Structure formats: C-alpha cells, structure tokens
C-alpha cells in the first residue's frame, strides 16, 4: 500500500499538481452570443470521424480512474474552475508564457489536481490518433467530468457538444471570478448570480464538495485561534474540529496535505455533504455557511433528507454550468496540443 492509499484510508492524502510549461499565444477575446449553449448539440460530432468520441473518452477515463480514483473530484473541480471564469472554454488548461500569467497559475488555482489535467491529456491523445484536430479540449473536459463522476456513483446525463477552445487565459480573471473558502452566502449569491445562477442553483453546485478535497490551509482559521474567546469556529462540531486538528497540526504542517471535504463518504457522490453541514461538519466556511445562514438552510435540510432530490437538481445545474459562456461556430479554435496547454 503506497502513501496515497494510506492517506485515503485516513481521509487525508498528499496532492502535488505538476506544472506544465508550454507556450501560449495571445489572441482576441471572443464573446459568445448564446447564454447557455443554444448552439451546442448532443450529436455535434455525428458526421465526423470522431462520432465515437464518447466511447473513446469513457474508456480512457476508466483507465485513469483505476490508476487514480481521486481524478473524479479533481476533474470536477477543474471543470468548475474553467466554466466559472469566462465560460467553459478550456482556458484553465492553457499554460503561462513569459508575457502572460495564465489562469492555472493564479493563486486560487495552484491546488488544481495534476491528475485532472492528465485525464484531459489522455483523452485528447486518444482522440487525436483517430481524428486529429476535430474535438475541442473544452468538450473533452465536459465529457470526462461526467464520465468520472459516474464512476463514484454520480448521475450520468447527456453532454451537449460543440464548444471551442479559447486562445486567452489570464490569472487575474480567475482571481476575480472564483469563490474563496471564506465566502458568505451573500458573497456566493453575488458571484453565482453574476454567472446567471440562482441561490438555489448555487447551493446545488456546492454539493460537488461531496467528493472534493482541500488543503489544510484553507480552513486552519476555523480550528485554531478562531477568536480571542474560542479556539474553534462555534459553528463547527467540537469533536469534528478535534478530528481535523489531528490531520492538520498547526506546527510543522505539510503544505501538501489535503483532507476530504466529506469525511463520511468521500468516495461516493451523494447528499452526505449536506447531512454533514447539518451536524456542524462542514469543513470550509462556505460549506457551513449554507446551513448557518437562514437564507439557504431550508434547501440544505431538504437535500440532507433526499439524495434523489439533490441528484435530480444537480443534473440540471451541472448541464447549465457546462453550457456557460461557450465559444461556438468560428469563435476560438480547436486546440491541437495533446496536453491542451498551448494555442495553435
């Protein structure tokens, strides 16, 4: 049993995302006119040599999942971080160049999992052997996310296709458009609202944390010296806080250590994330805020009682997110780099 296997059993493991250094050109910013993918189509590749792309991607993801089960959570997070920043255009996959710091190198993205980037690379490599220059990196990421999610018990759903890849990626955009671990419900509502999501949809998307993981540094302020009167955030279950302190000591903490956001069923996509917040076991401030804030508590309680309600809502919201701000038609390009890290 390796270090990763041991860590998974303990609910804590190491994740060190690799860096990819590849050139990226600068192009004009393309703005799509369709808000939620009106030009996308489930059968977009039907009349191309890539008509079997879903089978190819699924086979590739099965191999990736067998090699690294945490790829499911990592790829889902990568997809979210791509779509929330100027739309689902694979801009998060582009590498920085001497003249430009790309999204993936923004501080908030430095913890994106290396296995997630590799999942896209593996699928792109397989497809380029069959039909070079046809399938976009953005479509691959959307389909790979769905497939990996299904391997941890998540729902399967049709993925609309026809996204094109952006030629632009800026770290400053990621910093402005992604939520941090300490966001309040009002801040979350404002950010998600700017992307066209309702509060209800924001709470549903937060359920992605049922298979997520996070570095200790993102929540140390909740379990150590929270205030002059309390070591622990009073909204956190004291016993749970002590459990987290064992995984994340405040002395000589390894910055690469991460813990599962759902400590109960970390390998299963289900509604346990919401059950945990009801018990005061939300790890991030943003997690626990969903129950603490009376605006969102009723929905959290509903999801905690019904896995089917959460899953059905999730299918609708993840589909909407996947169609957010997409490039279509002649916008952007179909990236040819196997790692999707550089423009053509």
Q: How would you describe each model-predicted region?
A:
Residues 25-344:
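Catalytic cores of secreted/periplasmic or lumenal enzymes
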């Amino acid at each position: 049993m390796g270090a990763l296997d041991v860590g998974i059993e303990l609910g804590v493991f190491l994740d060190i995302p690799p860096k990819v250094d590849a050139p990226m050109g600068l192009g004009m910013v393309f703005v799509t006119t369709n808000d939620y993918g009106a030009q996308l189509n489930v059968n977009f590749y039907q009349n191309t040599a890539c008509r079997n792309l879903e089978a190819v991607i699924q086979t590739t993801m099965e191999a990736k999942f067998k090699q690294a089960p945490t790829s499911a959570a990592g790829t889902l997070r990568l997809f979210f971080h791509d779509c929330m920043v100027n739309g689902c255009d694979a801009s998060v996959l582009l590498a920085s160049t001497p003249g430009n710091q790309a999204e993936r190198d923004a501080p908030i993205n430095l913890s994106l999992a290396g296995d997630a980037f590799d999942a896209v690379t593996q699928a792109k490599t397989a497809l380029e052997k069959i039909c070079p220059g046809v399938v976009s990196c953005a479509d691959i990421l959307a389909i790979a996310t769905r497939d990996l999610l299904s391997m941890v018990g998540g729902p399967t759903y049709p993925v609309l296709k026809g996204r094109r890849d952006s030629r632009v990626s800026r770290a400053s955009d990621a910093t402005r458009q992604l939520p941090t671990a300490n966001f309040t419900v009002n801040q979350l509502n404002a950010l998600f609202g700017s992307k066209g999501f309702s509060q209800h949809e924001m709470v549903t998307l937060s359920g992605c944390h049922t298979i997520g993981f996070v570095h200790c540094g993102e929540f140390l302020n909740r379990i150590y010296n929270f205030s002059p009167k309390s070591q622990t955030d009073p909204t956190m279950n004291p016993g749970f806080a002590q459990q987290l302190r064992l995984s994340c000591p405040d002395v000589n903490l390894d910055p690469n250590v991460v813990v599962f956001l759902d400590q109960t069923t970390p390998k299963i996509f289900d509604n346990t994330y919401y059950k945990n917040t009801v018990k005061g076991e939300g790890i991030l401030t943003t997690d626990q805020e969903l129950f603490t804030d009376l605006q969102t508590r009723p929905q959290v309680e509903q999801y905690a009682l019904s896995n089917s309600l959460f899953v059905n809502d999730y299918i609708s919201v993840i589909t909407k997110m996947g169609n957010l701000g997409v490039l279509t038609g002649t916008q952007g390009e179909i990236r040819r780099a196997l790692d999707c890290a550089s423009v053509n």
